UniProtKB/Swiss-Prot annotation:
It holds the Pfam family Iso_dh. Keywords: Glyoxylate bypass, Magnesium, Manganese, Metal-binding, NADP, Oxidoreductase, Tricarboxylic acid cycle. D-threo-isocitrate binds at residues 94, 96, 100, 110, 132. It comes from the Bacteria. It is an enzyme of class 1 (oxidoreductase). It comes from Sphingobium yanoikuyae (Sphingomonas yanoikuyae). This is Isocitrate dehydrogenase [NADP]. Signal peptide: none annotated. Belongs to the isocitrate and isopropylmalate dehydrogenases family. Mn(2+) binds at residues 250, 273, 277.
Length: 406
C-alpha cells in the first residue's frame, strides 16, 4: 500500500540510554514504513544538550510551538553523578521543565489499559486521565518556622498604593507558617487546557478542590473554571454529549475509586502530584503511562512516555546482554502525537493509523507476548520476551493489520 501522507510536520525529540535505542526502532520499524511524514529532528541527548549549552532544548520547544505537535523520547535530567559520568559543563535543568515553561499548558497523564495485566484497582477498566495544574500553591510558597509567640499578618500592597492586610494567627508559642498564591490567568489557562483535553477524548471533566474550607482560594478555581466553561465550552460539551462538574477533593477521590474510568480529573498542583501517582500505581505500571502536554488553546501538544531512560537495562545492553524493556509507553508517545496531528490537519487516516498501532500493542500483550515487567505483574508462570523479540511481535502484528487496509 502507498504510505499515508501526514500533512504537516511533526517535531521529533530524541533522548537518552535505553529509551533512545527503542525510540529509533519505533521510528524505523513502526512509523516510517507506513507514514510519509516530515520529521523535524532535535537530538536532546545529554551530550548534545551539554555541547549546545542547552540551546537545543530551547530550539526544540520553539519548533513544537511553530508546528503544533512534538513527540519526545525520555531524557536524562543530570544529577551530580551524571555530571561526572558525562563530564558535563554544568548540571543542566530538566528538559521537560524547560519545554513546559516555553509552551505553557498542562501535563495530562493517561494510562494504557491492557485486559490481562492485573490492576491494583480491578474496577478501573478504562483510563483515568489526571491533569495537574503545575503552577503556584505549595510549590512556590514561602514557608518558615515561627520562633515564638507573636502575630502573623499577611499584607498586599497594590502598585497604586492600595493596601490589604489580614491577621492570620496570634501565635501563643513557636510553630510554622506558610503563604502561597496563584494567578487568575494561570487558572483560566488550566481550565481551557483541561476542557480541550476532555473534548479531544470525548470524556467528562471533573475539577477537584476544597472550596468549603478555602472559600476564597479554592473558590476562585471553582468560579474561574465555571466562567471559562460557560463562555467557551458549554455548547461544545453538550454537542459531544459530555459534562463538566466541580467536586470536593474527598468526594472525588472516593468517586474515582468507584468509577470505571474514561474521565479527565483536573487537579490543583499538590493534588495532581499525589493523585497522578495513585492512579499510575492503581493501573499497575509506569511502563504503561503516557504524558501529554497540551496548551490552553488546545492547538499545541507534546507527547512522551511518563517513565525515565531505563538506565539499568541500558547498562546490560552496553555489556552486550539482551534486555526485556517495555517499549509501549514510548510507542504511545508517537501515536498520541500523531493522533493530535491527524485531528489538527483533518486527516482521518493518520488518526486511524495511530489508533491501529495502539490496538496492535494492546492485542499483542493480550495475546500473551510481553516484556518481563508485565509478565511479573501477571504471575510467575507468565513467559516473557526480550526487547527485540517483543518489538518483532508488534512489527509483525502491525504489518498484518495494515495489510487489511489495502
Amino acid at each position: 500500500m502507498a504510505k499515508i501522507k501526514v500533512k504537516n510536520p511533526v517535531v521529533e525529540i530524541d533522548g537518552d540510554e535505553m529509551t533512545r535505542i527503542i525510540w529509533e526502532w519505533i521510528r524505523e520499524r513502526l512509523i516510517l514504513p507506513y507514514l510519509d511524514v516530515d520529521l523535524k529532528y532535535y537530538d536532546l541527548s545529554v551530550e548534545k544538550r551539554d555541547e549546545t549549552s542547552d540551546q537545543i532544548t530551547i530550539d526544540a520547544a520553539n519548533a513544537i510551538k511553530e508546528y503544533g505537535v512534538g513527540v519526545k523520547c525520555a531524557t536524562i535530567t543530570p544529577d551530580e553523578a551524571r555530571v561526572e559520568e558525562f563530564g558535563l559543563k554544568k548540571m543542566w535543568k530538566s528538559p521537560n521543565g524547560t519545554i513546559r515553561n516555553i509552551l505553557g499548558g498542562v501535563v495530562f497523564r493517561e494510562p494504557i489499559v491492557i485486559k490481562n495485566v492485573p490492576r491494583l484497582v480491578p474496577g478501573w477498566t478504562d483510563p483515568i486521565v489526571v491533569g495537574r495544574h503545575a503552577f503556584g500553591d505549595q510549590y512556590k510558597a514561602t514557608d518558615f518556622k515561627v520562633p515564638g509567640a507573636g502575630t502573623l499578618t499577611m499584607k498586599w500592597v497594590g502598585t497604586n498604593g492600595e493596601e490589604l492586610e489580614y491577621e492570620v494567627f496570634e501565635f501563643p508559642s513557636a510553630g510554622v507558617a506558610m503563604g502561597m498564591y496563584n494567578l487568575d490567568e494561570s487558572i483560566r489557562d488550566f481550565a481551557k487546557a483541561s476542557f480541550n483535553y476532555g473534548l479531544n477524548r470525548g470524556w467528562p471533566v471533573y475539577l477537584s478542590t476544597k472550596n468549603t474550607i478555602l472559600k476564597a482560594y479554592d473558590g476562585r478555581f471553582k468560579d474561574l473554571f465555571q466562567e471559562v466553561f460557560d463562555a467557551e465550552f458549554a455548547d461544545k460539551f453538550k454537542a459531544a454529549g459530555i459534562v463538566y462538574e466541580h467536586r470536593l477533593i474527598d468526594d472525588m477521590v472516593a468517586s474515582a475509586l468507584k468509577w470505571s474510568g474514561k474521565f479527565v480529573w483536573a487537579c490543583k498542583n499538590y493534588d495532581g502530584d499525589v493523585q497522578s501517582d495513585t492512579v499510575a500505581q492503581g493501573f499497575g505500571s509506569l511502563g504503561l503511562m503516557t504524558s501529554v502536554l497540551l496548551s490552553p488553546d488546545g492547538k499545541t501538544v507534546e507527547a512522551e512516555a511518563a517513565h525515565g531512560t531505563v538506565t539499568r537495562h541500558y547498562r546490560q545492553h552496553q555489556q552486550g546482554k539482551a534486555t526485556s524493556t517495555n517499549p509501549i509507553a514510548s510507542i504511545f508517545a508517537w501515536t498520541q502525537g500523531l493522533s493530535f496531528r491527524g485531528k489538527f490537519d483533518d486527516t482521518p487516516d493518520v488518526v486511524k493509523f495511530a489508533e491501529t498501532l495502539e490496538q496492535v500493542c494492546i492485542k499483542t500483550v493480550e495475546g500473551g507476548a510481553m516484556t518481563k515487567d508485565l509478565a511479573l505483574l501477571i504471575g510467575p508462570d507468565q513467559a516473557w520476551m526480550t526487547t527485540e523479540q517483543f518489538f518483532e511481535a508488534i512489527r509483525v502484528n502491525l504489518e498484518a493489520e495494515m495489510a487489511k487496509w489495502a
